[in-house]
A protein has these predicted regions:
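Short beta-strand edge/turn micro-motifs at domain boundaries
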Residues: 106-133
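Short, cysteine-centered beta-strand-loop-beta hairpins and adjacent loop/turn segments enriched
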Residues: 95-103
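Hydrophobic/aromatic beta-strand elements that line small-molecule binding cavities or substrate pockets
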Residues: 60, 74-79, 92-94, 108-114
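Short, low-complexity N-terminal intrinsically disordered segments enriched in polar/charged residues
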Residues: 1-36
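Residue-level preference for beta-strand/loop junctions
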Residues: 70-71, 84, 88, 105-107
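A solvent-exposed, acidic/Ser-Thr-rich amphipathic alpha-helical stretch
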Residues: 14, 27-83
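Short beta-strand segments enriched in hydrophobic/aromatic residues
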Residues: 34, 92-94, 126-129
Length: 133
């Protein structure tokens, strides 16, 4: 379901905030985007499945202590919504940088958000690298 321009802009803003804060190693800033619910979910390439704000926060705190930095650029972004629930799919490239080298590979990220009290919040984030044979 296509959405109105205001909702599309708000959901794309969530994506951009998530990515820029993650790349900046701003764990608290990333957490501000999530709903304060016990059943939020984040799936990353490093961890099988993170459930709840405690697991997501612990993962982010570990991430900021490590030498690897992740960043993303998006070639395509699609946004849909129905009422107070919105979702998006972004397709592009993930950068994985360490002190001595950087890798780039195809990446996809999807998000499910809910609007509460006039603010869009993350409920689920799923990131994955497609495998090509």
């Amino acid at each position: 379901m296509r959405t109105d321009a205001q909702t599309e802009a708000a959901l794309l803003h969530i994506l951009e905030c998530f990515c820029s804060r993650f790349a900046a190693r701003d764990a608290d800033g990333v957490m501000e985007l999530f709903a304060p619910d016990a059943d939020v979910v984040m799936v990353t390439s490093e961890e099988a499945l993170l459930r709840g704000t405690d697991e997501v926060r612990a993962f982010l705190r570990r991430y900021v202590q490590r030498p690897t930095t992740y960043s993303w650029t998006w070639d395509r972004r699609g946004v849909s919504a129905a009422g107070t629930v919105g979702w998006l799919l972004a397709e592009g490239t993930e950068g994985v940088a360490q002190a001595d080298h950087e890798e780039k590979h195809p990446y996809r990220m999807s998000m499910v958000c809910e609007k509460r009290c006039g603010r869009w919040l993350l409920l689920q984030v799923h990131g994955s690298s497609p495998h090509h044979e």
